[in-house]
């Protein structure tokens, strides 16, 4: 009884594989009719794909067989229907590349055209804005750098003093809070 169930489930998968092969053959024929790819017989392609499916089900592959092969060997090992589709896709990609190159050329020409139109306007803008006008303020970079260094030294000294004062103030604040009740706690801002 288990054999009849296994055979029943195997038949739909074989039918599905045959249908997939037929679809691939039909797609290859469409491509060939459009002049998109060169390839072998679609009948031999479908029989090849059925044979490959049967071999894969019967024999498990060793790790060496699963290793990636060089690209040419991989393409040669594909069924004819797949090869036809790959070639058709390559040709379509070349067509897309040609269209994209044409677009880029036209886009560059359009940019150049409008840059030429903008040149007089940009010249007028430059004329109106002109060069920087002189002013009474002078930049004294050396003196500012010296002042900055002195200011930074003063800040570091103040920060060290504040760090020493903070722990003492916190300890005094917690001691005062313990002595007083919860209602006597007044924020520091309110005391000032």
UniProtKB/Swiss-Prot annotation:
<feature type="coiled-coil region">
    <location>
        <begin position="86"/>
        <end position="112"/>
    </location>
</feature>
<keyword id="KW-0539">Nucleus</keyword>
<dbReference type="InterPro" id="IPR002164">
    <property type="entry name" value="NAP_family"/>
</dbReference>
<dbReference type="Pfam" id="PF00956">
    <property type="entry name" value="NAP"/>
</dbReference>
<protein>
    <recommendedName>
        <fullName>Nucleosome assembly protein 1-like 5</fullName>
    </recommendedName>
</protein>
<feature type="region of interest" description="Disordered">
    <location>
        <begin position="136"/>
        <end position="192"/>
    </location>
</feature>
<feature type="compositionally biased region" description="Low complexity">
    <location>
        <begin position="40"/>
        <end position="55"/>
    </location>
</feature>
<feature type="compositionally biased region" description="Polar residues">
    <location>
        <begin position="1"/>
        <end position="12"/>
    </location>
</feature>
<feature type="compositionally biased region" description="Basic and acidic residues">
    <location>
        <begin position="177"/>
        <end position="192"/>
    </location>
</feature>
<feature type="compositionally biased region" description="Low complexity">
    <location>
        <begin position="15"/>
        <end position="28"/>
    </location>
</feature>
<feature type="compositionally biased region" description="Acidic residues">
    <location>
        <begin position="140"/>
        <end position="168"/>
    </location>
</feature>
<dbReference type="InterPro" id="IPR037231">
    <property type="entry name" value="NAP-like_sf"/>
</dbReference>
<feature type="region of interest" description="Disordered">
    <location>
        <begin position="1"/>
        <end position="76"/>
    </location>
</feature>
<dbReference type="GO" id="GO:0005634">
    <property type="term" value="C:nucleus"/>
</dbReference>
<dbReference type="GO" id="GO:0006334">
    <property type="term" value="P:nucleosome assembly"/>
</dbReference>
<keyword id="KW-0175">Coiled coil</keyword>
<comment type="similarity">
    <text>Belongs to the nucleosome assembly protein (NAP) family.</text>
</comment>
């Amino acid at each position: 009884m288990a054999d009849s169930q296994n055979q029943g489930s195997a038949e739909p998968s074989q039918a599905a594989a045959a249908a997939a092969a037929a679809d691939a053959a039909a797609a290859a024929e469409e491509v060939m009719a459009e002049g998109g790819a060169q390839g072998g017989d679609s009948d031999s392609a479908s029989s090849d794909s059925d044979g490959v499916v049967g071999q894969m089900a019967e024999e498990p592959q060793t790790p060496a067989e699963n290793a990636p092969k060089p690209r040419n060997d991989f393409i040669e090992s594909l069924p004819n229907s797949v090869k036809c589709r790959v070639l058709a896709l390559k040709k379509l990609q070349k067509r897309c590349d040609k269209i994209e190159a044409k677009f880029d050329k036209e886009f560059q020409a359009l940019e150049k055209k409008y840059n030429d139109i903008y040149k007089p306007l940009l010249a007028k803008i430059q004329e109106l804005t002109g060069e920087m006008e002189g002013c009474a303020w002078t930049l004294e970079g050396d003196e500012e750098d010296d002042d900055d260094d002195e200011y930074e030294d003063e800040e570091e000294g103040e920060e060290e003093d504040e760090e020493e004062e903070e722990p003492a103030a916190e300890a005094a604040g917690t001691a005062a809070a313990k002595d007083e009740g919860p209602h006597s706690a007044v924020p520091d801002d309110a005391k000032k």
